[in-house]
Amino acid sequence: MPSMLVLVGTMPSLASLVSLGGACASVSGTSSSDASYALVKRVSLSRRSVKGTKKWLCRYSVSSSTTTTTADFIADQNNNSVSIDSNSFRGSKDGDDSEVVLKQTPKPVLKPPVARVERGLGVNTAPWSKDLSNGGKFDGEEERNKVIESLGEVLDKAEKLEIPKPGNKEGGEAVKPSQPSANSSNSRNGSYANASDGGTRKTKTMKSVWRKGDAVAAVQKVVKESPKIFNRGVQTEPRTREEGEVNAKAGTPLAPPQPPFRPQPPVRPQPMLQGKPMVAPPVKKSPILKDLGMAAKPLVSEEVDSSVKSKERKPILVDKFASKKKGVDPAASQAVLAPTKPGKGPPSNKFRVEHRNKKNASASPRRRIVAEDDGDDDASISRSGRKGRKWSKASRKAVRLQAAKDAAPVKAEILEVEEEGMSIEDLAYNLAIGEGDILGYLYSKGIRPDGVHTLDREMVKMICRDYDVEVLDADSVKVEEMAKKRQTFDEEDLDKLEDRPPVITIMGHVDHGKTTLLDYIRKSKVAASEAGGITQGIGAYKVSVPVDGKLQSCVFLDTPGHEAFGAMRARGARVTDIAIIVVAADDGIRPQTNEAIAHAKAAAVPIVIAINKIDKEGASPDRVMQELSSIGLMPEDWGGDVPMVQISALKGENVDDLLETVMLVAELQELKANPHRNAKGIVIEAGLDKAKGPFATFIVQKGTLKRGDVVVCGEAFGKVRALFDHSGERVDEAGPSIPVQVIGLNNVPIAGDEFEIVSSLDVAREMAEARAVSLRDERISAKAGDGKVTLSSLASAVSAKKMSGLDLHQLNIILKVDVQGSIEAVRQALQVLPQENVTLKFLLQATGDVSNSDVDLASASEAIVFGFNVKASGSVKKAAENKGVEIRLYRVIYELIDDVRNAMEGLLESVEEQIPIGSAEVRATFSSGSGRVAGCMVNEGKFVKDCGIRVVRKGKTVHVGVLDSLKRVKENVKEVSAGLECGIGMDDYDDWIEGDIIEAFNAVQKRRTLEEASASMSAAIEEAGV
């Protein structure tokens, strides 16, 4: 870049040729350095020849404070700037060039120095024309006119500028005290820099010719020029200057002559004059005042890119004496307050207001002024500082209260309550009250609900009545719903269906001959080996039946007939294709017969009636058929659609006809399944074997189950290690409709769960864990005897006059059974027992033999261990004996139910029963040494000493006590019979009146039954008016 004389125009420095009052800096070479600034008074241009070269001469006269300097510059053909004459003297004044008068202003606010930036061309830069510097023709008069015209134009525009108040960061930059440069002695104008160090003359502040402008102070200033502004095609870069310094580096070997050093007074910095940009400043956007608590928008700092700085438009001239009150911008009157954060901040006080005012005295207010287009301009700028206002404690509390109010439960108007009642927690939630309110209600009624979690339906109704909530009885899921048969076909299976064996379930009342019929079909003796002669589990068997001379496979399920095994019958009906209902010809339809028929109808399976025991005396098949027709099962012989076959299972009479009928019905159903897919089915039974571990009996409904498959059923999963058929033989696979026992599960599944084959153990584990989470709460609530409070319990407290507590007994039970289905059966049988005074609590219900851990649990909780179809080893029995734990093992469910009943009745308190033994009438009263004595005539029975007597006066009992003294003719006797007179005395009563009736009785303690206790509770409820 060729050297040239660069004229930069800013107010308190050497004026350029374009703007008077600017600064003139001599720049040599390609590097820029600091320059000396002063006020230009005269500028003249001429061309002269020096030593045979054509050069341009620039003569200017500068006035700085009281010093006037005249310097000559020449520019050679290479545009190198060289000084050929320089004079500096103090107190020089010309007639026309009077000293500049400046206005006095306060000291500007200092700002820390900013990093030095490469200096570029100024706003009003007037570079030398390249053509002229290379020796072109120059018309001095024409150029002089152009300069004068441009200077006048600048003066006119400067007088019209609006000057914002000083100190505002928006109006200009703070200045920095000038410091003499280390290399100022080498610079061409070094004398001016040195004058600030050695000058002692007092600076005079006078009125400025600019009328408006910054004050003049002999302090160092840091002047940051405006950001990039395009003016006359020249782009300026932001830079920092230190006033009073000139660092001009010569671009040629020729060194300029230096004037002799003379001390000078301090240089007066002049107000800056920035050239007015060609593009008009944008209209001020309406500010958005944010809350004081919000983070203030950071000002553009040195780290921010210069492209961001260029978006800020700052005034050119700054007047320190301008009014601090800004003019009202019309756009600012339409400012919109931004929404604040939720919650009310802490109230402001005087101290905070004063502190805020002091802190922001020289800065902008704490309220952010956000332009409407900030979102577009500053979208990519990362702003430092706080993210937002910290909420006060009151704000956080208000938000928490509002959130709690929104999440508060809503009072229900109608509440459905199931038969087993409702927990206290659920009731409190539905009534939108606290659990303490319900507990307080129970205490007010004389109930101490310690450890109580569930209220029965009647108690819930009574509580809801006080809160004006209607209660509806919600029926629990009936067993018929469990028996509903599910669809086993998928669309992808329709093209691969094959015939499958029918699944036939034998159902009916207990002891009607179901297992005997199956024994004849299987040619086995299962019934003889059953405990008590009754079936207590589902038996699945595969049998080959001869049909038309060919053997066809059938699967028979033998279900229990006892009332306690309703769930088992429902599961049997759910997987069956045909239901055989066995009815004894000598007994007719019984309760379990009706239940089995209901299960079959719910499962929508065909029904075949087998009227059994026709060879027995008193058998009446016609009566049975008539009873069946009365409940909707019309025999085919009578024009109906229900096949009925009269058989004798014991002798095998007509059993073949029954099988032929069953196979005909199965053929009409066209039973098919897809064996070429992963197996799916249902668990009909499950248990824990001491040698095999957890096992389960599956009925495959579709697909083929193979050894090695990964199976998941409910919360149990595992890899199939072994498969056993109904006879105990190992098999490798099981197709549709085939029952099979599976070994390899991690725990005992729940009977009735569906199983399916998955790809890996990880998938099976995830599915089992998800299922376990959903079943955990159901299992907890399903435990019987978890402390239920009933109206009978309330009546017990009322009748016993025990208002301080609840007279409630509890029997803790640990139940161990052989298979999962037996748990359901035992619990259903025990739930039938009245539990108004004694409740049952099952601490543990599991499959497997009795173990030492069961004994430890029973010892800690004072429970009884009941085992059903399980065993207890000798070591376990010995440990139980040492710890005082009772173990009861049963093979028949009848015996278990009877013993549990006896245990519950043993916890009931005995009642006192008064047995009358005699009656007497008071004929006279007399006094004796021991008090008043009643002379009586024994009308009936006898009176015995120390027996109980009751004094009845006018039909009302006035006293009940013990006969303490009995005399006959002044002699103490033990007994007085009817028809004799005697004297009767009591230690605690002597208010005898003639005509009183005295009744004698004996008090005996009598044990109550559960039914008697329940009746007494009902009477207490009525008496209490609850």
From Swiss-Prot:
Which residue intervals make up region (G3)?
558-561
Keywords (alphabetical) are: Chloroplast, GTP-binding, Initiation factor, Nucleotide-binding, Plastid, Protein biosynthesis, Transit peptide
Q: Which Pfam families match?
A: EF-G_D2, GTP_EFTU, IF-2, IF2_N
A GO cellular component term found in this entry reads:
chloroplast envelope
Residue ranges for the region (Disordered) are 158-208, 230-284, 300-393
- In which residue ranges is the amino acid composition biased (Pro residues)? 254-269
Keyword Signal annotated? no
Compositional bias (Basic and acidic residues) at which positions?
Answer: 158-173, 306-317
Q: Where is this region: G4?
A: 612-615
Tell where it localizes: Plastid, Chloroplast
Principal location class: plastid
| CDD domains named among the record's database cross-references | IF2_eIF5B, IF2_mtIF2_II, mtIF2_IVc
- GO function terms (MF aspect): GTP binding; GTPase activity; mRNA binding; translation initiation factor activity
Domain tr-type G residue range list = 499-672
Q: Work out whether the entry's keyword set contains Membrane.
A: no
- Where is this chain compositionally biased, Polar residues type? 178-194
Annotated GTP binding sites:
508-515, 558-562, 612-615
Q: Where is this region: G5?
A: 648-650
For the region G1, give the residue spans.
508-515
Note down the stretches annotated as region G2.
533-537
Transit peptide range per the UniProt entry: 1-63
Q: Which InterPro entries match?
A: EF-G-like_DII, IF2_II, IF2_N, P-loop_NTPase, Small_GTP-bd, T_Tr_GTP-bd_dom, TF_IF2_bacterial-like, TIF_IF2
Role played: One of the essential components for the initiation of protein synthesis. Protects formylmethionyl-tRNA from spontaneous hydrolysis and promotes its binding to the 30S ribosomal subunits. Also involved in the hydrolysis of GTP during the formation of the 70S ribosomal complex.
HAMAP family in the record? IF_2_B
Protein family membership:
Belongs to the TRAFAC class translation factor GTPase superfamily. Classic translation factor GTPase family. IF-2 subfamily.
This one is known as Translation initiation factor IF-2, chloroplastic
Organism listed in the record: Arabidopsis thaliana (Mouse-ear cress)
